[in-house]
C-alpha cells in the first residue's frame, strides 16, 4: 500500500542477542555453583565420574533452546536434499563452477558419481535399513567349478609340503642306505594316491553330469506324461459335457412336446366352454323375446279397449267445438319393459294425438 500502509514501530531492546542472563554472575544459580567449587570455564558434573572422559566443550557451553514453530515431526528435515536445507540443484551448480575453474570432465564426472552414490545409499538406508550382502555358497549348478579349483589348489599345496618333507627326510637319513631305499617308496605311493584322487574326482564329475542329464530326461518324460494325462482328462470332460448337453436337449424336447399337448387340450376345453356360454346366452335371449312379445300383445289389447271407450266423448266435443283435455285412465297394470315396449308406447301416443282434435289444433297452431 506504500505510504498509506499502517506503520508498525519496533523498539530494539538493550540486549538483542539475549546474552545478559549468561553473563550475569549475581544470579542465585551462579553463586550456588561457585560455593560448591565450580569455576567459570569448567565442565558440569563430577570430575571423578565414570563418564567424565566423554565430557566435551558442549558441557561447558550454554544450552540452546530451539522453539518448534512448524507442523513437521520431531527430527524432520526441511528440504529434499541430503542435509538440512540443502537445495536439490546444488550439485549441478557445483559442476558448472568446477568447469569455470578449469576442472577436467573426468574429475567432475567422478564427483557427480560420488554424490549420486551417496544419495542412493542414504535413500536405501532410510527405506530398508542397512543392507549387507553375505556370500552363502553355490546353490544350483551342473558343475561347481569354484569348489573344484579350490580342491586342486589344496592338493597342489599338499604335494609341495610332501616333497619338502621328503627332501628333509633324505638329508637326515643319508647315513643309512636302507632308509634311502625305503624313502622313495612312500613318495611314489603318495603320488599314486594323488593321481587316484584326481581320477576319482574326474569320475565323480562325469557321473554327476550323467546324473544331471538323466534327471533332465526324466523331468521331460514326466512333463510329457502329465501333458498327455491332462489332454485325456480334457477330452473326457468334453465328452461328458456333450453327453450332458444331449440329455438336456432331449429333456427339453420332451418337455416342449408335453407342454404343446397340454396347450392343445386347454384350448379345446376353452372352446367347449365358450360354446356352452354362447348357447346359454341364446336361450336366455329367446326367453326374454317371448316375454316381451306377450307383454306387447297385452298392451295393444288394453290400448284398443281404451280407444273404444274414449271415442264417444271425442265425437260430442267436436260438435260443440270446445277444447277439453283428455285424461287417460291408468289401467293399473305394469307396463312392459324393453325396447319393443317403448316403441309400442310411442306409436300408441302418436295415434292418440292424431285422434284428438284439440291436440291437432295445438300442433298445427289453429285457433278454435
Swiss-Prot record:
Instruction: Give start-end positions of Low complexity composition bias.
Output: 313-324
Composition-biased stretches (Polar residues):
15-27, 325-334
Basic residues biased stretches: 209-226, 242-254, 271-283, 301-312
Q: InterPro entries, alphabetically?
A: G_patch_dom, PINX1
Key words, A-Z: Nucleus, Ribosome biogenesis, rRNA processing
Question: Quick one: where's region Disordered?
Answer: 1-28, 161-339
Q: Where is the composition biased (Acidic residues)?
A: 168-182
Enumerate the spans annotated as G-patch domain: 25-79
GO CC annotation, single: nucleolus
The highest taxon in the source lineage is Eukaryota
Q: Which GO terms describe its biological process?
A: rRNA processing
Q: Which residues cross the membrane?
A: none
- Family per similarity comment: Belongs to the PINX1 family.
Task: Explain the purpose of this protein.
Answer: Involved in rRNA-processing at A0, A1 and A2 sites and negatively regulates telomerase.
- The name under which this protein is listed is Protein pxr1
What organism is the protein native to? Botryotinia fuckeliana (strain B05.10)
Gene expressing this chain: pxr1
Amino acid at each position: 500500500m506504500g505510504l498509506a500502509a499502517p506503520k508498525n514501530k519496533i523498539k530494539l531492546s538493550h540486549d538483542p542477542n539475549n546474552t545478559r542472563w549468561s553473563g550475569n554472575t549475581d544470579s542465585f544459580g551462579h553463586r550456588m555453583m561457585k560455593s560448591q567449587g565450580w569455576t567459570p570455564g569448567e565442565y558440569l558434573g563430577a570430575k571423578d565420574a565414570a563418564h567424565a572422559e566423554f565430557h566435551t566443550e558442549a558441557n561447558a557451553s550454554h544450552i540452546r533452546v530451539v522453539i518448534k514453530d512448524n507442523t513437521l515431526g520431531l527430527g524432520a528435515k526441511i528440504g529434499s536434499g541430503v542435509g538440512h536445507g540443502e537445495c536439490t540443484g546444488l550439485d549441478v551448480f557445483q559442476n558448472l563452477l568446477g568447469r569455470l575453474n578449469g576442472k577436467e570432465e573426468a574429475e567432475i564426472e567422478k564427483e557427480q558419481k560420488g554424490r549420486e552414490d551417496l544419495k542412493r545409499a542414504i535413500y536405501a538406508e532410510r527405506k530398508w535399513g542397512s543392507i549387507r550382502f553375505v556370500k552363502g555358497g553355490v546353490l544350483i549348478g551342473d558343475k561347481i567349478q569354484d569348489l573344484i579349483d579350490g580342491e586342486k589348489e589344496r592338493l597342489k599345496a599338499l604335494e609341495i609340503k610332501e616333497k619338502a618333507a621328503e627332501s628333509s627326510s633324505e638329508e637326515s637319513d643319508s647315513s643309512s642306505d636302507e632308509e634311502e631305499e625305503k624313502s622313495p617308496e612312500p613318495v611314489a605311493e603318495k603320488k599314486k594316491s594323488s593321481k587316484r584322487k584326481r581320477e576319482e574326482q574326474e569320475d565323480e564329475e562325469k557321473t554327476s553330469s550323467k546324473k544331471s542329464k538323466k534327471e533332465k530326461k526324466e523331468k521331460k518324460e514326466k512333463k510329457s506324461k502329465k501333458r498327455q494325462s491332462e489332454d485325456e482328462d480334457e477330452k473326457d470332460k468334453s465328452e461328458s459335457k456333450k453327453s450332458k448337453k444331449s440329455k438336456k436337449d432331449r429333456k427339453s424336447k420332451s418337455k416342449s412336446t408335453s407342454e404343446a399337448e397340454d396347450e392343445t387340450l386347454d384350448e379345446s376345453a376353452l372352446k367347449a366352454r365358450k360354446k356352452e356360454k354362447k348357447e346359454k346366452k341364446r336361450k336366455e335371449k329367446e326367453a326374454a323375446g317371448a316375454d316381451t312379445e306377450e307383454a306387447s300383445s297385452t298392451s295393444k289389447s288394453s290400448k284398443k279397449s281404451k280407444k273404444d271407450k274414449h271415442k264417444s266423448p271425442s265425437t260430442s266435443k267436436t260438435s260443440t267445438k270446445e277444447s277439453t283435455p283428455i285424461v287417460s285412465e291408468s289401467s293399473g297394470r305394469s307396463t312392459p319393459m324393453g325396447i319393443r315396449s317403448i316403441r309400442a308406447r310411442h306409436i300408441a301416443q302418436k295415434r292418440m294425438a292424431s285422434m284428438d282434435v284439440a291436440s291437432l289444433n295445438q300442433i298445427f297452431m289453429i285457433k278454435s
